[in-house]
Amino acid sequence: MASKGSNTDCMSCSVLNWEQVSRLHEVLTEVVPIHGRGNFPTLKITLKDIVQTVRSRLNEAGIAVHDVRLNGSAAGHVLVKDNGLGCKDLDLIFQVSLPSEAEFQLVRDVVLRSLLNFLPEGVSKLKISPVTLKEAYIQKLVKVSTESDRWSLISLSNKHGRNVELKFVDCIRRQFEFSVDSFQIILDSLLFYYDYSENPMSEHFHPTVIGESMYGDFEAAFDHLQNKLIATKNPEEIRGGGLLKYSNLLVRDFRPMDKDEIKTLERYMCSRFFIDFPDILDQQRKLETYLQNHFSKEERSKYDYLMILRRVVNESTVCLMGHERRQTLNLISLLALKVLAEQNIIPNATTVTCYYQPAPYVSDVNFSNYYLANPPVPYSQSYPTWLPCN
């Protein structure tokens, strides 16, 4: 386990041991392909190189980077190697000041221009504009600017779901959903070592690296990660995506730490999901995107995941009219059938019709005695300057 650091003087922090620092080095120096659209070449980057390049250029542009952190499942992987969550997300957090729109735009331009450094040799860079780079390599751009949240996200595209996500945070109200995804590892000491030390790291000679749990209690969160336990704080603050993450934990054999409180947690998450995604098409897009990003190489787990999600929605949704709830359940069922069809387990199910018993709603003129499940509605992904945060 990471050892408690006396210099951190807080329950939320801990010093990484050599095994964890060594694993962190592997994550930061692993080559990750960033796939270009069309005829654009694949960029081969490491997290170490992209962090050093972006941080240096931000400082040159007058935006001070207070620290850089590894976040999400990659941080969890560093702390506990075989934790059941894998290491799909490569999330980096840059702590910066974003007082106005100008800083948001400057951060975006710096990241896009930094990508020029990673183009293969022989590629002419003279006529490649930031707009062109955005269309070629950016999977997602998000900007949030409210009283309690000021941050932006730039996601570099990887067709296998290992997007490199660069998050620039001024302030953010909540940085985690569950204790097991609350870890952040501060990279500055290791980055300093890369810049100035000529000696290779060893068990007896390596920088002190601090890990922090946004959950507030590092040892408790670490225990939850080791033992696959689901716990959180202030569940009413969890946004709509928390329901999808919770179901993801369940399909990976995590279990609730407190079985008495879990039903309340499930009701909170279901309610928030339908608040954030009230339209059936929004729900479909969110679910399909989540499956693509989190189960790209786990086709056999998709069906189990959707069935768990369906059970939770069926048992814990209290904020919807009956027909709205059934419409969402039907959507999840159709996605599950589609997954089975793609695995050649059953015939294609894009025109399955689901029949309902209409008795409780027969007096409702808007109620139909059957619901025809149309094929999934096609939609084209666009890449505007900024996407709203969901």
UniProtKB/Swiss-Prot annotation:
Keywords: Cytoplasm, Cytoskeleton, Nucleotidyltransferase, Nucleus, RNA-binding, Transferase. Its main location: nucleus. GO terms for cellular component: centrosome; cytoplasm; nucleoplasm; nucleus. InterPro entries: TET5 (IPR012937). GO terms for biological process: mRNA stabilization; negative regulation of cell differentiation. This is Terminal nucleotidyltransferase 5C. Belongs to the TENT family. It is found in: Nucleus; Cytoplasm; Cytoplasm, Cytoskeleton, Microtubule organizing center, Centrosome. One of its GO terms (molecular function) is poly(A) RNA polymerase activity. Disulfide bonds: none annotated. It comes from Gallus gallus. It catalyses: RNA(n) + ATP = RNA(n)-3'-adenine ribonucleotide + diphosphate. The keyword Membrane does not apply. Its EC number is 2.7.7.19. Catalyzes the transfer of one adenosine molecule from an ATP to an mRNA poly(A) tail bearing a 3'-OH terminal group and enhances mRNA stability and gene expression.
